[in-house]
Amino acid sequence: MTNIRKSHPLTKIINSSFIDLPTPSSISSWWNFGSLLGICLAVQILTGLFLAMHYTADTSTAFNSVTHICRDVNYGWVLRYMHANGASMFFICLYLHVGRGLYYGSYTYTETWNVGIMLLFAVMATAFMGYVLPWGQMSFWGATVITNLLSAIPYIGTNLVEWIWGGFSVDKATLTRFFAFHFILPFIISAMVMVHLLFLHETGSNNPTGIPSNMDMIPFHPYHTIKDILGLLLMLTALLVLVMFSPDLLGDPDNYTPANPLNTPPHIKPEWYFLFAYAILRSIPNKLGGVLALILSILILAIIPLLHTSKQRSMMFRPISQCMFWLLVADMLTLTWIGGQPVEHPYIIIGQLASILYFSIILIFMPLASLTENHLLKW
């Protein structure tokens, strides 16, 4: 008799995706982040669902409802801080996942890569709208500043901003619709994750060498499930340490002040995971130019497969490209630091130089490094 795992229509899908899936034997811990992102998404949906049971999306009660969750709901503070810091974990895993894709040439699976970019945009949109919901000072002013960027679009800009706001400023209508979108988007993301996995399983996983590994495959379970569980335990430990010991480490103190349209905070800045893009936005003096640079800083990932000039897929054996990659990582960390600093000398010029370097590395230096390596290897 055939094992029910392999014959039943439902378990067959699970079996071919997570149990008997042929996986390269050489994949390292850098391949753990996909499963960690899945866990992050599940944690965010669960904690978010329970938070939504107590939260009220109304300008007069939103801030107090969050306070009520933290003070009066049983373990409400755990839910709230797991959700807030879970978002930070989500983005740490996301950036490491994208970085691994860049380093090992996983972007040559173009469908998987492009769905991944759409997922990145969707997660960023969800996180931005979630940050508005507690209705603190940074929530209100962050929403005002970021939505106002759309007014830079010629001709339709102002009408578009007022349409998104549902009025002439960020108010009750804005908060209500942001809550609705923040609630529905994670489920859309879940569906997109299925598509991401569907495309991935069409080609199979890449591996550190970048060489096809069809000759050397092992089943996903138990070998990689055990490895993923180790990664999960490490991530959950980090998350719980953050939640239990310093839950506000990554937050902004201004968000503990209720939103006040008459009082602007001295430094308006988004959460840490958007600071690199925010620094690129601020480094261009023109509003429309800044908005375009902001969008392109993420959208540039879509043209990376076209910029792949190397004869090798992975950077494992390409030292010049490795230098360029780590220079890009250092540049992104610099941009993240600059995004959190006030707009004054010397931060302005550092931000502008780092922004130019960011686009230069991806568009010019990396393809040139690959061509140089091809030439050195007489290819």
Curated annotation (Swiss-Prot):
Single GO molecular function: ubiquinol-cytochrome-c reductase activity
Binding site for heme b b562: 83, 182
Cofactor binding remark: Binds 2 heme b groups non-covalently.
Record keywords, A-Z: Electron transport, Heme, Iron, Membrane, Metal-binding, Mitochondrion, Mitochondrion inner membrane, Respiratory chain, Transmembrane, Transmembrane helix, Transport, Ubiquinone
Bilayer-spanning residue ranges: 33-53, 77-98, 113-133, 178-198, 226-246, 288-308, 320-340, 347-367
One CC-aspect GO term: respiratory chain complex III
GO term, biological process aspect, one: mitochondrial electron transport, ubiquinol to cytochrome c
Cofactor: heme b
Lineage: superkingdom: Eukaryota
Membrane topology recorded in Swiss-Prot or TrEMBL: Multi-pass membrane protein
Pfam families per record: Cytochrom_B_C, Cytochrome_B
Residues that coordinate or bind a ubiquinone: 201
Annotated positions binding heme b b566: 97, 196
Extra facts: Heme 1 (or BL or b562) is low-potential and absorbs at about 562 nm, and heme 2 (or BH or b566) is high-potential and absorbs at about 566 nm.
Family statement: Belongs to the cytochrome b family.
Protein's recorded name: Cytochrome b
Species the sequence originates in: Natalus major
